């Protein structure tokens, strides 16, 4: 139970950067919150899979091991997909990608890095708790 609570709290803390503005052309003028990463279908499914893998006891232990990782990777993919698809119409696909990278606030990168670090933190906590329970 202690491990489940710790992993849940760490995951929720890793989502804090999404509460800040991550996309836009200028601070205070046009800002898009990182919450859109969680409200798209991939983000919603990723969060559900993460918590399902932690809190639901499946018959096969591999499912409990895999679901949180799938959820964490899903959050990262959700962030990257939103980066590349949020909206500035352009004349070509290449211009659209240039616009996306030029109109990202630093908190996007902070959130992305924290999401990647979360995978390693999760693995460390999971290994340490498993070692202690044997």
Task: Name each model feature, range by range.
Residues 4-14, 94-128:
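Alpha-helical membrane-associated segments of multi-pass integral membrane proteins
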């Amino acid at each position: 139970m202690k491990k489940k609570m710790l992993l849940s709290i760490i995951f929720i803390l890793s989502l804090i950067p999404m509460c800040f503005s991550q996309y836009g052309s200028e601070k205070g003028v046009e800002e898009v919150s990182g919450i859109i990463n969680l409200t798209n279908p991939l983000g919603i499914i990723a969060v559900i899979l993460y918590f399902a893998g932690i809190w639901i006891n499946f018959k096969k232990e591999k499912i409990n091991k895999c679901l949180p990782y799938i959820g964490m990777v899903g959050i990262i993919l959700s962030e990257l997909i939103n980066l590349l698809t949020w909206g500035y119409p352009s004349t070509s696909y290449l211009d659209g990608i240039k616009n996306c990278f030029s109109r990202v606030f630093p908190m996007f990168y902070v959130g992305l890095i924290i999401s990647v670090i979360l995978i390693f933190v999760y693995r460390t906590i999971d290994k340490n708790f498993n070692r202690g329970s044997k």
